[in-house]
């Protein structure tokens, strides 16, 4: 009887301890197959931009990026190249700065304008004012890629992650994840690698 009481006591404490442990939170944001909603954000040219403006587009290369992050800077030329090649076949680049400029003034809208002019961006560079868009996507880094395709269901998420397997040096790229995904969509084939880890700087959020 003593053994039974002891066993019940041990089981009780295990149960209480398990209840006290925080549950693992599911990552929020879009997953492969999710349907992305549209947004309307200000571009560096002063115009408001939404995805519905692109009637002839087959989809979009959404890239969360910023002005100051060395990983973002290292990928700017790659984004320009991707935009120049793939917007002609229906997949333009849409870049979005998700950072709060109150945390890092280098990410201000004014400095976005300067950066876009200096680098010669061929794509819209939008400011996520109020930080409402990036949480919907689930972006955590800059740069962070979301490849969308127009389907009967809506804008379907087809690829999430990095542009390629070299976050800094383009000369060391051996796997081009985003290009492979785009080419698969254009060829009507299944994407082999649908998700990779985004490598970059954490998105700067005002936690006050």
Task: For each feature predicted by the language model, list its residue ranges.
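Bacterial Sec-dependent N-terminal signal peptides
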Residues: 1-24
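Short active-site neighborhood of thiol/selenol oxidoreductases, capturing the structured segment around
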Residues: 50-73, 182
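Loop/turn elements at helix/coil->beta-strand transitions in domains of secreted/extracellular proteins
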Residues: 57-59, 88-93, 120-124, 142
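Structural microenvironment flanking redox-active thiols in thiol-disulfide oxidoreductases
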Residues: 73-118, 129-135
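Thiol-/selenol-based redox modules, centered on thioredoxin-like
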Residues: 147-208
């Amino acid at each position: 009887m003593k053994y039974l009481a002891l066993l019940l006591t041990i089981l009780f404490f295990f149960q209480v301890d398990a209840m006290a442990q925080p549950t693992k939170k599911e990552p929020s944001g879009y997953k492969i197959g999710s349907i992305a909603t549209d947004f309307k954000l200000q571009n560096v040219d002063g115009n408001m931009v939404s995805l519905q403006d692109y009637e002839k587009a087959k989809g979009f290369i959404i890239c969360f990026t910023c002005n100051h992050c060395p990983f973002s800077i290292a990928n700017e030329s790659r984004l320009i190249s991707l935009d120049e090649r793939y917007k002609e076949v229906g997949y333009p680049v849409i870049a979005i700065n998700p950072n709060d400029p109150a945390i890092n003034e280098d990410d201000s809208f004014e400095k976005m304008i300067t950066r876009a002019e200096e680098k010669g961006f061929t794509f819209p560079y939008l400011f996520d004012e109020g930080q409402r868009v990036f949480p919907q996507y689930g972006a955590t880094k800059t740069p962070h890629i979301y490849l969308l395709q127009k389907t009967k269901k809506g804008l379907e998420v087809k690829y999430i992650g990095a542009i390629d397997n070299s976050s800094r040096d383009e000369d060391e790229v051996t796997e081009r994840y985003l290009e492979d995904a785009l080419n698969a969509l254009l060829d009507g084939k299944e994407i082999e690698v649908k998700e990779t880890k985004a490598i970059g700087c954490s998105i700067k959020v005002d936690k006050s």
